[in-house]
Amino acid sequence: MSVQLLDKTRKINKLLHNNNSHKVVFNDICDVLSDILKSNVLVISKKGKVLGIKNREDIPEIHELIEDKVGLLIDSMLNERLLLVLSTKENVNLTTLGFDSDNIEKYQGLLLPIDIAGERLGTLFLYKLDAQYDIDDIILGEYGTTVVGLEMMRSVNEENAEETRK
């Protein structure tokens, strides 16, 4: 294992260990993943709601089909395509997801289903311009997906506990 991979893994770990509120905010994990994977990052719920987002200044945003604000819904057909992805897909041609804006062929996507305890909770969607994802990127993406999935489960459990108390 390379030292760089270990260092990047530790950056993700810090989200879990250095958090006083005991909650990982989805934008925080997007910030970290964007930094270490040099990508624009979205956390999307199973229903298509944007839970977290980070766009880098050096990568032009794709506005087509994607809402770039937390709480808004992405295009329903795009969400259906994302939910059909059952395992990590790297270096995805974004035209296969329905994007057709100018220069879209220059982008590469990394699609990571968020599955915890056999339940699909959403998708981690990353993309970058003029570069491919390598094996280290995939490892870090999958690790980040685990952190996001655990936080999603914690959020669901807290909501259920609150409803039970009412």
For every predicted segment, state its role:
Residues 1-166:
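Hydrophobic, helix-rich cores of sensory/ligand-binding and other regulatory modules
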